Amino acid sequence: MAKVKFFKTNSAWGLEREVNEFIQNKNVINISYTVAECGYGYIHCCCVLYRE
């Protein structure tokens, strides 16, 4: 069964580190990434679809 993990941060570098640590030893199906401008900066979001 597939699972989804959602990440959100205000740092692209922090998001990349978190996602890279998470996907180790996972069977990744898809990774989607988006960035949105907010009044105070940017929000970086990533959604990982995977199987354990």
Protein language model features and the residues they cover:
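Generic structural motif recognizing short loop/turn segments at the entrances and edges of beta-strands
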Residues: M1-K3, N25-I31, C45
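Short amphipathic
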Residues: A2-N10
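A solvent-exposed interaction/effector surface
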Residues: T34-G41
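Short linear sequence elements within intrinsically disordered, low-complexity coil regions
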Residues: S11-A12, N27, C38, C47
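Acidic, metal-ligating active-site segments
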Residues: G41-E52
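A short, charged, amphipathic alpha-helix used as a generic interaction element across diverse proteins
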Residues: W13-T34
